Amino acid sequence: LERWKSRFSGDAMGWLQVLGEVEALSSFANLHFNFRDWAFPEIEEESGVFRAEALGHFLIPPEDRISNDFLAEGRGTILVITGPNMAGKSTFLKALGVNLVLGLAGSPVCARSCRLSPFKLYTSMKVSDSLDKHLSLFYAELQRLKVILEVILRGEDVFYLLDEMLKGTNALDRQAGALALMRQLVGFKASGVVATHDLELTRLEEELPEKIKNFHFDGFVEGDQLRFDYILKPGKCESFNALALMRKIGIKI
């Protein structure tokens, strides 16, 4: 036994790596077996391509899932998504992120078809403060954005997802910072999606129409009930529901 250990112990890490790859590939094969309608993505040689038909979040049951087409092509492209609370903005960003990770790992994705460039995915979503690290919410957001910006400035092919960025500060500073960051990002080959309630950001489509496109999710009020169709539509959102939600819980507005 000692002779065997002496001879082969140096190979143990290689064996574990192969076993890990087999487990990962087995998991992907299991996904394909159980979800035959999922597509294997085609990997693009050119940078900046993320195209999908009927893309959805796989953790939502098929009977409840609303899928959407998505297209982001070209360096510096930013899709700005607006919409009322609970309309599906954050869930859609999560769907983009998880499917991008799955697809580039070699797995089928929850979509009818998909084409991807070999992006590196970076996100600023659900950022929180930290008592242990003495970080306020706003500074934690800045630290996350700093990491993303540094990678982009190095010229790497990045796809980013920014959900309600800079929400930890006042409205004026948030708008100024978000507008400045987006104007900076379009100058690099990274592309991504920004979800926001701030309609001021949608004006960038007029300023940079070849780089920035507006999309939105809708919400509807029927009687005292809120309704959502979770369908991604072109253009900026024209209706919001925050006041209706406040009234619903008893705030007299």
Model-derived features: positions:
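Long, non-coiled-coil amphipathic alpha-helical linker/lever segments
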Residues: 1-26, 128, 132, 144
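ATPase nucleotide-binding head domains, primarily ABC-like/P-loop NTPase cores
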Residues: 28, 35-253
